[in-house]
Amino acid sequence: MRSNYLFTSESVSEGHPDKVADQISDAIVDLYLSRDPEARVACETLVTTQRIIIGGEVRSAVPVSEEEIEKTVRETVREIGYEQTGFDWRTAEFANHLHAQSADIAQGVDAGEDKDEGAGDQGIMFGFATDETPDYMPATLYYAHRILERLAEDRHQKKVDFLEPDAKSQVTLVYENGVPVRASALVLSTQHSPALSSKEGQAKLRDYVKSVYEDVLPKGWMPDDKAIFVNPTGLFEIGGPDGDAGLTGRKIIVDTYGGAAPHGGGAFSGKDPTKVDRSAAYVARYLAKNIVAAGLAKKVTIQLSYAIGVSEPLSLYVDTHGTGTVDEAKIEEVLPKLIRLTPKGIRTHLKLNKPIYKPSAAYGHFGRKADGDFFPWEKLDLVDKLKAAFA
């Protein structure tokens, strides 16, 4: 395992077109779950210039009206902050193509008198945790998220008047002996108002971004000025869905571990928690984080796999990357004794049948604060049980 290297992760803001789509899709998931905790939802979203299109499959014991769906979609876009000529929450055309879930899928997934609830699809899902940040996340992604959250905070609180919603960040860190010690390059592109179109305006933006870097990064981590790139292509006035079309599920590395861990390929947003693409990835993160917090490893990757219609996972794999203090096979043996890794077992343990998903659709699904019903997969309530299992 290498100990001295450079590593890079990127993040995108809540106003990035793909994230706009993710937030709309998860707002629809939350809307249905708020009416029926057992609702089935698979909602995809396309956003482009003055158009919002949703489609997919739903099943709910409580009907949700077309008007409620449209109101939820427009409110989501309003909260992000889009009131631009090319994309305005009030006037964008909206089309709803949601329809009933396939009966073929339902018969294989639903629980019956003689069987447990099956997985909603086949697939592989990964969880990861590392001790390099307090949130047990890769430092590169942690800081990439925090930088953009700071920009959004300043924009929403009107601390600055020149930022628009669309932005991207990228952080390259120097690792020495496996520990991040400083940044070697920082990249940020942010949509801005026409007021910054002049050379002086671009200099003002650069100074502002540098001040954010200095506040967010640990002291002494700033790279050379020539390695700080702010809007490197020049002006960025046309952005959001007007500049690029956005689709649900296209930022899966931003959503997870910034490239520091494998990804099974399944996106999260727009899916109710019976879909193991989402719930199994959440429980894999939950297990990985608790393993590291319990001191059983400094870094761990977990893989789960499922077959559609089958409740129990087909495989469970644990890799501590040479940092473990206990045998990996023993961890694999212990984990299913602490939590049932069936779709229903996961949803029950983590209490996932609630309208809690829209906040996860921007700035990462992992490394967030478990707060009330939100982000329950970030809780550390297995630590004592894991320690006891290896005492």
Curated annotation (Swiss-Prot):
<dbReference type="GO" id="GO:0005524">
    <property type="term" value="F:ATP binding"/>
</dbReference>
<dbReference type="Pfam" id="PF02772">
    <property type="entry name" value="S-AdoMet_synt_M"/>
</dbReference>
<dbReference type="Pfam" id="PF00438">
    <property type="entry name" value="S-AdoMet_synt_N"/>
</dbReference>
<dbReference type="InterPro" id="IPR002133">
    <property type="entry name" value="S-AdoMet_synthetase"/>
</dbReference>
<dbReference type="InterPro" id="IPR022631">
    <property type="entry name" value="ADOMET_SYNTHASE_CS"/>
</dbReference>
<dbReference type="GO" id="GO:0006556">
    <property type="term" value="P:S-adenosylmethionine biosynthetic process"/>
</dbReference>
<comment type="similarity">
    <text>Belongs to the AdoMet synthase family.</text>
</comment>
<feature type="binding site" description="in other chain">
    <location>
        <position position="16"/>
    </location>
    <ligand>
        <name>ATP</name>
    </ligand>
</feature>
<dbReference type="InterPro" id="IPR022630">
    <property type="entry name" value="S-AdoMet_synt_C"/>
</dbReference>
<dbReference type="GO" id="GO:0000287">
    <property type="term" value="F:magnesium ion binding"/>
</dbReference>
<feature type="binding site" description="in other chain">
    <location>
        <position position="57"/>
    </location>
    <ligand>
        <name>L-methionine</name>
    </ligand>
</feature>
<keyword id="KW-0479">Metal-binding</keyword>
<keyword id="KW-0808">Transferase</keyword>
<feature type="binding site">
    <location>
        <position position="267"/>
    </location>
    <ligand>
        <name>ATP</name>
    </ligand>
</feature>
<feature type="binding site" description="in other chain">
    <location>
        <position position="275"/>
    </location>
    <ligand>
        <name>L-methionine</name>
    </ligand>
</feature>
<dbReference type="GO" id="GO:0006730">
    <property type="term" value="P:one-carbon metabolic process"/>
</dbReference>
<keyword id="KW-0630">Potassium</keyword>
<keyword id="KW-0554">One-carbon metabolism</keyword>
<feature type="binding site">
    <location>
        <position position="271"/>
    </location>
    <ligand>
        <name>ATP</name>
    </ligand>
</feature>
<feature type="binding site">
    <location>
        <position position="18"/>
    </location>
    <ligand>
        <name>Mg(2+)</name>
    </ligand>
</feature>
<comment type="function">
    <text>Catalyzes the formation of S-adenosylmethionine (AdoMet) from methionine and ATP. The overall synthetic reaction is composed of two sequential steps, AdoMet formation and the subsequent tripolyphosphate hydrolysis which occurs prior to release of AdoMet from the enzyme.</text>
</comment>
<protein>
    <recommendedName>
        <fullName>S-adenosylmethionine synthase</fullName>
        <ecNumber>2.5.1.6</ecNumber>
    </recommendedName>
</protein>
<feature type="binding site" description="in other chain">
    <location>
        <begin position="166"/>
        <end position="168"/>
    </location>
    <ligand>
        <name>ATP</name>
    </ligand>
</feature>
<feature type="binding site" description="in other chain">
    <location>
        <begin position="250"/>
        <end position="251"/>
    </location>
    <ligand>
        <name>ATP</name>
    </ligand>
</feature>
<comment type="subunit">
    <text>Homotetramer; dimer of dimers.</text>
</comment>
<keyword id="KW-0547">Nucleotide-binding</keyword>
<dbReference type="Pfam" id="PF02773">
    <property type="entry name" value="S-AdoMet_synt_C"/>
</dbReference>
<feature type="binding site" description="in other chain">
    <location>
        <position position="101"/>
    </location>
    <ligand>
        <name>L-methionine</name>
    </ligand>
</feature>
<feature type="binding site">
    <location>
        <position position="244"/>
    </location>
    <ligand>
        <name>L-methionine</name>
    </ligand>
</feature>
<dbReference type="GO" id="GO:0005737">
    <property type="term" value="C:cytoplasm"/>
</dbReference>
<feature type="region of interest" description="Flexible loop">
    <location>
        <begin position="101"/>
        <end position="111"/>
    </location>
</feature>
<dbReference type="InterPro" id="IPR022628">
    <property type="entry name" value="S-AdoMet_synt_N"/>
</dbReference>
<feature type="binding site">
    <location>
        <position position="244"/>
    </location>
    <ligand>
        <name>ATP</name>
    </ligand>
</feature>
<dbReference type="InterPro" id="IPR022629">
    <property type="entry name" value="S-AdoMet_synt_central"/>
</dbReference>
<dbReference type="InterPro" id="IPR022636">
    <property type="entry name" value="S-AdoMet_synthetase_sfam"/>
</dbReference>
<keyword id="KW-0067">ATP-binding</keyword>
<comment type="pathway">
    <text>Amino-acid biosynthesis; S-adenosyl-L-methionine biosynthesis; S-adenosyl-L-methionine from L-methionine: step 1/1.</text>
</comment>
<dbReference type="GO" id="GO:0004478">
    <property type="term" value="F:methionine adenosyltransferase activity"/>
</dbReference>
<keyword id="KW-0963">Cytoplasm</keyword>
<keyword id="KW-0460">Magnesium</keyword>
<feature type="binding site">
    <location>
        <position position="44"/>
    </location>
    <ligand>
        <name>K(+)</name>
    </ligand>
</feature>
